[in-house]
């Protein structure tokens, strides 16, 4: 058992899977839950995985951060639509000189946390994971699982490979989770957006799985156009994404099992969509420096309309 104590904020498809793997490998893990608390506190966690199913009959489950111990590493695995809760959730459980590991999609999340806790170390994690929460405490891991880690510094300046990244990498790799270490977190975030913007966005707008988007000539072309706009957005912030990476993402998705994206699942279940973190923030960062991304701009406005109507039955009206 390693000496680092982990807290998992958001025990869903992502946090539940990685937290369960860490505990199974001997880490001291503490899970914050909301609606699933009673079930998980009583019965633990079940992970059904392509790599082998397993059950954790007992876990450290909490429904209140005030009851949780101070932890060395706090894993933020909430949807970004819940980030307004972080000023209340994070300060009670992060040790002085502790680490906040942000396993969230999109751009700008590390900056938000640095404003809340300027004294802690922040590491961004980019997860390449196909996983769904089937029920309370029941996670179905379909494919992949790799995490790419990069440490945050003010303005997303390049931090290189730090000792803190190496320590977390060791714990996760001991748990059977593949880790890649990044010298440049901002480049990594933009690379992740190459996949996230087209597939998450179009899956909602067009009511389609990833395999359907890739099987049709017209939608595949649209996916590729959106990817090249993400490349242009990255360039506007001084980061270069090679064309070969875009081709790799297209090939990777063709080989993937048919997948309903996380944004599509949220839409189908009438939950708030991560439109701002995944689409809005990158779009606005590019616009701030005079770079227009017309396809992404169109996608953003479509998603804002669908998200508002889906959850409230009302249209978004300027105040």
Swiss-Prot record:
Which keywords accompany this UniProt record? Cytoplasm, NADP, Oxidoreductase, Pantothenate biosynthesis
* Keyword flag Transmembrane helix: no
Which GO terms label this protein's molecular function in UniProt? 2-dehydropantoate 2-reductase activity
Query: Which GO biological-process labels does this protein carry?
Result: pantothenate biosynthetic process
- Which Pfam families does the UniProt record give? ApbA, ApbA_C
Kindly give the SUPFAM superfamilies that the UniProt entry links to this protein. 6-phosphogluconate dehydrogenase C-terminal domain-like (SSF48179), NAD(P)-binding Rossmann-fold domains (SSF51735)
In terms of InterPro entries, this protein maps to: 6-PGluconate_DH-like_C_sf, 6PGD_dom2, ApbA, KPA_reductase, KPR-Related, KPR_N, NAD(P)-bd_dom_sf
Binding site residues for NADP(+): 10-15, 105, 274
Query: What residues does substrate bind to?
Result: 105, 196, 200, 262
Question: What positions constitute the catalytic site?
Answer: 192
* Pathway(s) where this gene product acts: Cofactor biosynthesis; (R)-pantothenate biosynthesis; (R)-pantoate from 3-methyl-2-oxobutanoate: step 2/2
Of which family is this protein a member?
Answer: Belongs to the ketopantoate reductase family.
Task: Give the function comment from the record.
Answer: Catalyzes the NADPH-dependent reduction of ketopantoate into pantoic acid.
The entry's protein name is 2-dehydropantoate 2-reductase
List the source organism: Nostoc sp. (strain PCC 7120 / SAG 25.82 / UTEX 2576)
